[in-house]
Every structure is written in structure tokens, then in C-alpha cells.
Amino acid sequence: MVMTDPIADMLTAIRNANMVRHEKLEVPASKIKREIAEILKREGFIRDYEYIEDNKQGILRIFLKYGPNERVITGLKRISKPGLRVYVKAHEVPRVLNGLGIAILSTSQGVLTDKEARQKGTGGEIIAYVI
């Protein structure tokens, strides 16, 4: 099966597993997916993740996080798509829900959150919004 947008597939898998309250999910791994999972962990949206080495590309196992009666991730949206890339300059980096959510950006300094990009004064491609 050929994937046309592996990042969107990962975000959709997380969104679907979150809706049915699965404890964990597995997606094919890549460097950018690991960096996105690291940001989600650091910002408190997922409990943890681990990279499982196989003889192909590897597997990323993501452990989801839930509150007592609610989901931690309420919204997950892919912004820049293969058919329509969305780039922003340093002074145009968006705030998601006035700071309640995060924007994940791919920059020349790596994959960063919107706060980190503003602090470093760098723009880039908006990968996704997480609320």
C-alpha cells in the first residue's frame, strides 16, 4: 500500500484511537513522525511513545493519555498537505485557540511548537494543529 501522506495517516490513527479510547496504537515510523510524537509527549497530549526496530522502517507505538472523564486531545488537524503546502514567516506563526492548543511546525531548526518557533524567531511549514 502506497501512502500519499504518512503524517496525515498518523494523525488520523491517533484521532481514531483517541475517539474509541484505545490505550495505545502503532503506526509505521519515520524521523518526522518520531519528532511529532516527541512534541506531543513533551506538551502533555500523549503519555509516551516508543520506537520498535524491525527489519524495515520500524514501528512507532504511541500510548494515549486520558483525563478522568475526558480526552486530552480534543482536536487534531493536518494543515499543510502535499497538494497545498502552508508556510508562515516568523512574525506570522499562529496561536491555536489563544494558546490553549499548539501548532506543530517544520522549520530549518527541526520540528518545533508554535511557542518555540516564536522564541527562536523562525518560520516554517505548519504541519498540524493540536487542541
Swiss-Prot record:
GO CC terms:
ribonucleoprotein complex; ribosome
The coiled-coil regions, if any, are none
Q: Which SUPFAM superfamilies match?
A: Ribosomal protein S8 (SSF56047)
For this protein, what is any one GO molecular function term?
rRNA binding
Keywords carried by this UniProt record:
Ribonucleoprotein, Ribosomal protein, RNA-binding, rRNA-binding
* Pfam families membership: Ribosomal_S8
- Name one process (GO BP) from the record: translation
Q: Spell out the family assignment given in the record's similarity comment.
A: Belongs to the universal ribosomal protein uS8 family.
Give a short account of what the protein does.
Answer: One of the primary rRNA binding proteins, it binds directly to 16S rRNA central domain where it helps coordinate assembly of the platform of the 30S subunit.
| PANTHER family, per the entry | 40S RIBOSOMAL PROTEIN S15A (PTHR11758)
What is the protein named? Small ribosomal subunit protein uS8
Species: Geobacillus stearothermophilus
This protein's gene is called rpsH
